[in-house]
């Protein structure tokens, strides 16, 4: 218990009793695999019915409730994953009126949607699970390309790896805003992280480092999540160590 050793899990994975017992025996942190991602929590019908173009509505589906209830009942701290991501975020979230075929909204509208989305997610979860220990949250996920620059603008559902966030904002300003809003609404003591993969690629590592360093100096970001999709042949120990020590 000197530090956290965690695992990612989903509703399906914790359903068998053996899996529950394994998690409780070996880990003291859980990251919901899909259950806190935007496409799981956003409610298009409720957002349209609400009639407020800047206030996306959220829900807690059965899959999310199952994982969070398991963690709350067993005093398992969780790491929230994730508020802002180019993937698993429905296109309608970026469209006028939350309509499937609506025009892309302005930065000013998206600012308010992002803030309200983060607020609504946190408020909804805290209200239903008041004893849940959310000790960390991945605020922004996988915003960088391997060359160290931002992802190309566009729909990830049309162009693999493209970002509607970049389509709306055109630069990394949405990352700063996401951390600003998250810091405003997450529970007291919850640490905020930028999360990505392949940080051991030097160009990507340096791009992430420069951004996170600036966020940290502004007291907005507490650290970096390294997904560590590793094999025995790549990356080398030297590359991985260089990324950690950066």
Go through each PLM region and give its residues.
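Glycine-centered flexibility motif
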Residues: 6, 170-171, 219, 225
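Acidic-and-aromatic substrate-binding clefts and catalytic sites of carbohydrate-active enzymes
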Residues: 7-18, 39-41, 54-62, 144-146, ...
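Boundary/entry segment of secreted carbohydrate-active catalytic domains
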Residues: 1-35
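Aromatic- and acid-rich polysaccharide-binding/catalytic face
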Residues: 24-36, 135, 141, 190-196, ...
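Alpha-helical scaffolding within the catalytic cores
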Residues: 13-25, 62-66, 172-180, 198-215, ...
């Amino acid at each position: 218990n000197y530090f956290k050793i965690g695992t990612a899990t989903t509703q399906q994975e914790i359903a068998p009793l053996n899996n529950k017992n394994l998690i409780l025996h070996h880990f003291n942190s859980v990251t919901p695999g899909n259950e806190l991602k935007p496409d799981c929590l956003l409610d298009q019908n409720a957002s349209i019915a609400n009639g407020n173009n800047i206030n996306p509505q959220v829900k807690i589906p059965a899959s999310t409730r199952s994982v969070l209830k398991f963690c709350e009942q067993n005093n398992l701290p969780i790491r929230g994953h994730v508020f802002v991501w180019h993937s698993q975020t429905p296109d309608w979230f970026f469209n006028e009126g939350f309509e499937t075929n609506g025009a892309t909204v302005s930065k000013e509208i998206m600012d308010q949607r992002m803030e309200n989305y983060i607020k609504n997610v946190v408020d909804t979860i805290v209200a239903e699970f008041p004893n849940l220990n959310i000790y960390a949250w991945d605020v922004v996920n996988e915003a960088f390309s391997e060359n160290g620059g931002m992802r190309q603008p566009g729909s990830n559902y049309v162009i693999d790896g493209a970002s509607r966030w970049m389509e709306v904002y055109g630069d990394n300003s949405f990352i700063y805003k996401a951390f600003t809003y998250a810091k405003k609404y997450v529970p007291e003591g919850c640490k905020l992280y930028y999360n990505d993969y392949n940080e051991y690629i030097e160009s990507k590592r340096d791009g992430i480092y420069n951004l996170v360093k600036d966020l940290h100096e502004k007291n907005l970001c507490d650290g970096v999540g390294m997904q560590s999709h590793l094999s025995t042949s790549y990356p080398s120990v030297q590359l991985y160590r260089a990324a950690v020590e950066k």
